[in-house]
Amino acid sequence: EDTGGQPMTEVVREINTDYDGQLESIKASVSYDVLEMSGSRAVWKEVLAVYAVKTTTDPDDPQEVASMDDGKKALLKEIFWTMNIIGSRTESKTETVIEESDDGHGNIVETETTVTQTYLYITVTHKTADEMAEQYGFSADQRKQLAELLTDENNSLWTAVLYGITGSDGQIVAVALSQVGNVGGQPYWSWYGFNSRVEWCACFVSWCANECGYIEAGIIPKYAGCVNGVAWFKERGLWQDNAYEPRPGDIIFFDWDDENGQDGLSNHTGIVEKVENGRVYTIEGNSGDSVRQRDYPLGYYEVLGFATPAY
């Protein structure tokens, strides 16, 4: 509950945006040929649980957590950045690549070429709530309070506080939002069954659906290709074109206007978070190789359409 100041949902989104900005500034600060990202962030409920215990039990200045002011916001940001560490390094690699060309007589000629490429590695690591309790020197009572806040019984509370979501129909949105900031997609494509990185936007949607039990229930398919996902929903009459105003939990499919132009086939997918002031807000995997919140105008031309799962 918020009794004054900035709502918690806004502060969380602001910090998520700062985090995305840090990733983008690292990419912009160095010239590279290949980008490899890996790692995962601390989940927001752990960040907020540490913040709640630290705020309410501070022996020098105990405060309630229902309202957010500049001082509390600064503390929350400090805890977030203590729990989440972004590291980066570059490495030059000399590799042999085989190039194919036509000799002009219909014959394919293979030529070995040595190429030196700069790799940019970005890694995200995080501290757990228990590690933060150790770092802050929490007492036994504070640790007990922290553990109680993090029990599964409080998951619906965290969903409401963090994302403003109440009720079971927002379950997949809450799961997707809990993954914002994860990079490289390894948990999602490896869960799907791939041994190495693939374009993982659909794997992410499938993973979120699986966490909610929706794949087993036949509500959302397990799909790694966007075209297959569109076909599954269309066959079941669960499809709307881009003139539709989506609801939270709908699946959005894109047809990017890239160098090859649009072909009426989907090549990217995500989960609808909400619609507000004529814009659709989404959570997307493999957006710049990260899980990110994005937003677009309703009816945006690169949106192919929406799947409407029968939750």
Q: Where are the model-predicted features located?
A:
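Secondary-structure-rich domain cores
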Residues: 1, 178, 213, 244-245
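Membrane-proximal envelope biogenesis segments
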Residues: 1-170, 174
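Extracytoplasmic/periplasmic, Sec-exported soluble proteins
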Residues: 11, 164-168, 193-201, 240-244, ...
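Active-site signature of cysteine proteases
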Residues: 276-311
